[in-house]
Amino acid sequence: MTMQLAAMLSRWEPQRDTDEWILGTVYKTEGSSYRKPGAMSLISSGGEQLGLLSGGCLEADIRLSARKVMASGIPVCIRYDGDDEDDLSYRLGIGCGGVVHVLLEPVNVENNYQGLQDIQRSLANRQSGYLKQHIPAPGTVSLPSHYIVES
């Protein structure tokens, strides 16, 4: 995943201020899923998507939800349930039958780009660290993510 993340961030960095960006993160799964917790994607207002959060079947709905986050500026958590016939992911054919929880949050200068520049720098310098993401409870606002370099 480190190489995928490094490649994604190197493609994002030159464009970070030309479009609005949303960071999508799989933060929890239940049962089987194509991507595991920690999978990330960056979605731009120009329609570009760097990385995937599913096997492809959820991406269109994730991009639609990302546009709503761009408009509101408020992070959201989305739950896709492949076993629930009433859930959108069931109708989309999620395929795995599991549950995927996704956090979508704005990425901009005001929130220090959610720590993504720090991650990119650490990867380039071969330093280890971790990203602390705040998953908002329903009806609450998320705090910005913070990247912490381990020494």
Predicted regions and their residues:
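Segments forming oxygen-rich coordination pockets for charged ligands
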Residues: 1-151
